[in-house]
Amino acid sequence: MNKLYKKIVCFTLGFGLMVALCGCGSNTPKVQSEGMKSVGSLNVEEAAIYTDDSEKEDVIETYSSADGLCVIERYPTYYDVSLDYGKGEPVEVGKAYAQTILEAVPDFADTFEPYLHENIRGAFNGRKINYDALEERIETLINSLPEDYRDEVISFAKTLSQGEANYAEDGHAEDDYAEDCHVEYGHTEYGHAEDGYAEDGRLSYIEALTMQIIPDALRPTACSALSLGGEKTVSGKRITIRNLEWNTGSNNQMTNIHAVTHMKKGENSITTVGILGLLDIITAVNDDGVMIAILDVGSKEELPFVYNDKKCYTFEIRYALEHFDNAKEAGEYLVGESGDFTWCNNLLCTDEKDAFCCENATKEVAATGKARSVLRTTESELMEGLAWDSPDALCIVNSFATKGNQDGFTGAEFNITRFVKYNKWVKEKDKFSIADAKGLVAREVVDQFVVSNVHNSGNVHTVIVDYATGKIHVAFTKGDHADDIPVFWEVGTY
């Protein structure tokens, strides 16, 4: 294959990224490319050919809970899940979801449990794992969830682990249990909690709770997003693109359980793109077109992890999608809650009219004076040395970008490179169609590690929301890594 090498440094110089030294978190941080190497960008040999339409897969098999609260359709590439909160209480939906998963995917535990433990080991970064401390962390965070979410998650975990988690005859958690969500080893009334964290081929109760809050308790990896306003699109309506990069497991097991989940309550609904069994939000859009997706940022201060009096931001996103019909109010809500989150993060937040990035700093990081929470817009002034040349487009990577905020670009070539590439690609084209948007993630060879790509080996899914039609297009990674030219599927409309 002919591989065209384009120097990253050329991109950097061309778009004015400063290399002068600058202290992290100063009032006017300057982006610098300290430590960058002149390496090539390996492009695909031939340009991808896409259309605005995406094919639809055919259903292989359908599974339903006895009460009809959960329906799972198995497609060749993903699972389509419908959860009906209009016909049942959250605790009943949680139970129905777990029961249907056990029927549809009998080896679900064999798939998810090893992945969960890989994330746990990654969170402890080689240190000896204190499982008692981890259990306390999980219990505390689960207890912080709003009551409906907490009951749903507990019911799901109780059913999936096939234990008896101190439930009343009506299926609701007992008040004392719901209040402190306490699990004690050796007490069989708490289901399989006595097994605790053990890689034994089944998901214990505490493991089934932990899987619901991996981003909040253990932390994700990298992502990027781009939202093109009407002035940059052929249709005159917004197009939003989201790349999720995450650990898919040592055997890429998560690529076998992609899921599109429809959370319905009457006329209202949320469509999430994530992993089968998860009730939090990774990437989602509600029926009003409010789209929110998570991107990790973290802190440069090496502060201790705090979980007491904290909130799970992935469930706060779900709350925002359920209660707000526009991106501005949803974004303002999430920025307002961000001091109580467990990690600093960026949140893509768009609707047909607007695009925002919630630059969310925890109160501990904000107290250092190095970061602050702010709702970034296309008009926000960027930190010194960071160039963006398309006024009607918003780009997000794994760093804050607003002037005066924590600088996660300096010394982070991955962030610099992706931001510069997005800037170049958006600038060089007048208006984008959906086909063009798909083509943005099909420009570079994926299976390489010497350069930083927009569409790279860590990609789990790419979601494109077309505000002209309401269609949701998704490319799911299957196997070792994403395809150089991914296939997009239409998974429904919002």
Segments predicted by a language model, with ranges:
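Internal mixed beta-strand/loop scaffold within catalytic domains of large alpha/beta enzymes
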Residues: A208-K311, F315-E316, H473-V474
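N-terminal compositionally biased, intrinsically disordered segments and leader/signal-like regions
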Residues: L13, P29, E189, T378-E379
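Bacterial N-terminal signal peptides that target proteins for export
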Residues: M1-T12
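C-terminus-biased signal that marks the final domain/tail of proteins
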Residues: V31-E164, E194-A222, L321-Y494
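C-terminal motif of bacterial Sec signal peptides marking the signal peptidase cleavage site
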Residues: A20-G23
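Long, intrinsically disordered low-complexity tandem-repeat segments
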Residues: Y167-A198
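Bacterial signal peptide processing site
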Residues: G25-N27
